């Protein structure tokens, strides 16, 4: 019996100890989860803008074609700006004189080449009247891209040094009293010199016999040699001969004196009838054939701007009494359209035009 009680006591003690240990123990803590550290995502390098491919132009010499002979105003101005442009582009630029058909021959030659920027046209105001004068069906903004218009010039009336005329009034009075007797050398029909003479016929009653030459240079040579009685040409082409006593400039086709040439009388101060139509002078600029790639014409435009910013160009214009202009893009197009309208309708109104400007869609603008 004692044996069973002893066994019972042992079991009870074991059970009690078990319960005690269970009550005193705490549940084991679960291992803490380690924080998840996200690996930084490497940023992809930003794409750099693709470099524009280098323009492969010019890779050979460029030809700048002038539609009049050497020594005329277009040639003189081209020879002032083109050498500077040549430095800026780093390639040779040859000036080629191709006179004929009031520069339309040269322009046509340019249009018949590949429009790749290697054959350019250095043109002038005569481009605006080719259609009206029935010279050739070409238009300055339809067939060409005006890269840069650079200058305007002033026409002047000049006579040989031994001429009996010492003023514009004396010459006009003689031309009124003796119709057709006086010969006036010009660069050809439709040019500014020709139109200036027509204005004198239309509004002053004078009457001349116009003698066309293949450019202003030959016309000036003719007047200095006495082959014609007078010429109307750009001042920059005659100022040295005037100062040297080889011809006499009687008047400028302006309403104000030419700075530096105070002895030259503005014809608008003598004849009020001409005042509304002057100053009437030509423009000059560099043109590319339509179809020339835009990147090439843009390049040429930038290089022309650099050339015109060169102090040598400023000095050149000042010495030759040129008015600088700086037109390209739409501004040049608007200028050319306005000039074309003015010139074409003036020729038509004076009876010198072969065709009406209306045939070519040239609108008449207000004066």
Regions found by a protein language model. Name each.
Residues 1-10:
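Bacterial N-terminal signal peptides that target proteins for export
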Residues 19-23:
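C-terminal motif of bacterial Sec signal peptides marking the signal peptidase cleavage site
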Residues 25-26, 30-142, 181, 189, ...:
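N-terminal (or domain-start) structured segment
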Residues 59-61, 243, 298-367:
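An extracytoplasmic/periplasmic, membrane-proximal ligand-sensing/linker region
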Residues 85, 109-119, 131-218, 267, ...:
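Hinge/capping helix and adjacent helix->loop/strand transition within the periplasmic-binding protein
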Residues 125-136, 198-203, 230-265:
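A ligand-binding cleft/hinge motif common to bilobed small-molecule-binding domains
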Residues 145-148, 272-279, 313-318, 322-323:
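Mobile beta-alpha loop/short-helix "lid" or hinge segments that flank ligand
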Residues 239-309, 358-367:
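C-terminal lobe and pocket-closing loops
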């Amino acid at each position: 019996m004692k044996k069973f009680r002893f066994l019972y006591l042992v079991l009870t003690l074991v059970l009690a100890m078990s319960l005690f240990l269970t009550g005193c123990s705490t549940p084991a803590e679960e291992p803490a989860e380690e924080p998840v550290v996200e690996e930084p995502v490497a940023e992809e390098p930003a794409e750099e803008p693709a470099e524009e491919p280098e323009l492969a132009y010019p890779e050979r010499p460029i030809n700048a074609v002038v539609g009049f002979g050497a020594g005329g105003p277009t040639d003189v101005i081209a020879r002032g700006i083109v050498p500077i442009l040549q430095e800026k582009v780093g390639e040779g630029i040859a000036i080629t004189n191709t006179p004929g058909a009031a520069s339309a021959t040269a322009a046509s030659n340019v249009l018949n080449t590949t429009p790749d920027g290697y054959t350019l046209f250095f043109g002038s105001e005569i481009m605006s009247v080719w259609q009206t004068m029935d010279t050739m069906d070409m238009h300055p903004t339809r067939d060409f891209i005006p890269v840069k218009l650079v200058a305007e010039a002033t026409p002047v009336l000049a006579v040989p040094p031994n001429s009996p005329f010492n003023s514009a009034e004396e010459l006009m009075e003689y031309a009124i009293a003796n119709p057709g007797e006086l010969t006036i050398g010009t660069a050809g029909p439709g040019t500014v010199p020709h139109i200036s003479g027509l204005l004198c016929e239309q509004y002053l009653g004078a009457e001349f016999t116009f003698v066309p030459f293949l450019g202003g240079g030959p016309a000036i040579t003719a007047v200095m040699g006495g082959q014609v009685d007078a010429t109307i040409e750009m001042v920059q082409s005659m100022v040295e001969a005037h100062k040297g006593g080889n011809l006499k400039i009687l008047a400028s086709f302006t309403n104000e004196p030419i700075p530096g040439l105070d002895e030259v009388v503005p014809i608008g101060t003598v004849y009020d009838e001409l005042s509304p139509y002057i100053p009437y002078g030509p423009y000059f600029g560099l043109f590319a054939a339509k179809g020339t790639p835009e990147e090439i014409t843009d390049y040429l435009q930038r290089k022309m701007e650099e050339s015109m910013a060169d102090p040598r160009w400023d000095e050149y214009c000042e010495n030759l009494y040129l008015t600088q202009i700086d037109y390209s893009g739409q501004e040049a197009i608007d200028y050319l359209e306005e000039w074309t309208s003015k010139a074409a309708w003036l020729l038509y109104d004076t009876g010198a035009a072969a065709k009406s400007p209306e045939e070519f869609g040239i609108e008449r603008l207000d004066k």
